[in-house]
């Protein structure tokens, strides 16, 4: 699974 930090930036800066 992806890390929380990665997800945060992923959907936040998609």
Curated annotation (Swiss-Prot):
Lineage, opening ranks: Bacteria, Pseudomonadati, Pseudomonadota, Alphaproteobacteria, Hyphomicrobiales
Function: This protein is involved in control of the biosynthesis of tryptophan.
GO annotation terms (biological process): L-tryptophan biosynthetic process
Organism of derivation: Rhizobium meliloti (strain 1021)
Superkingdom assignment: Bacteria
Name the record gives this protein: trp operon leader peptide
Keywords: Amino-acid biosynthesis, Aromatic amino acid biosynthesis, Leader peptide, Tryptophan biosynthesis
Keyword Amino-acid biosynthesis included in the entry's annotation: yes
């Amino acid at each position: 699974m992806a890390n929380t930090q990665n997800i945060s930036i992923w959907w936040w800066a998609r």
